[in-house]
Amino acid sequence: MSDPSFDVVSEISRPELTNAVTQALGEIKNRFDFKGSKSDIQLEDEQLVLTSDNEAKLESVIDVLVSKMAKRGLGLKNFDFKSKIEPATGGTVRMKVKIRKGMEKEQTKEVTRIVKESKLKVNATIMGECVRITGKKKDDLQEVIHLLKNSDLPFDVQFTNYK
């Protein structure tokens, strides 16, 4: 029998993101401070497009969306909320929030460095946009999961493909 393993990935659950956007739109539609405003959230392939009447209302849209994402368990580190607010048609303002998918090469190296510095008896192998962790004991793998969850990484990690 092969050694137990799992993959460390950084991705967003698309159905959960769709649910969070739908819930945020529902709240925006029903809230008193948004009555008569042109506030909207659109989910595109690689980004979210947030639109509102002015910057203050756009900040409120962001707050509503972030709270719904947090309730649905979506990691906020995979979204770039620091993009600039730009004018849009009809006297509105717009913000494009980039969705980060997968781990870049530096991020996979960071994960393997953390695992190797832990001195646990596990192997970390970079496999494209994920890192495969293998070890003799499941307890060691659980320690790696705990270690990575508690690490202050600039991106969110999920654990998949348990074997």
Swiss-Prot record:
InterPro entries: DUF520 (IPR007551), UPF0234-like_C (IPR035571), UPF0234_N (IPR035570), YajQ-like_sf (IPR036183). SUPFAM superfamilies: YajQ-like. Signal peptide: none annotated. It holds the Pfam family DUF520. GO terms for molecular function: nucleotide binding. The keyword Nucleotide-binding applies. Keywords: Nucleotide-binding. Belongs to the YajQ family. This is Nucleotide-binding protein LA_3406. It comes from Leptospira interrogans serogroup Icterohaemorrhagiae serovar Lai (strain 56601).
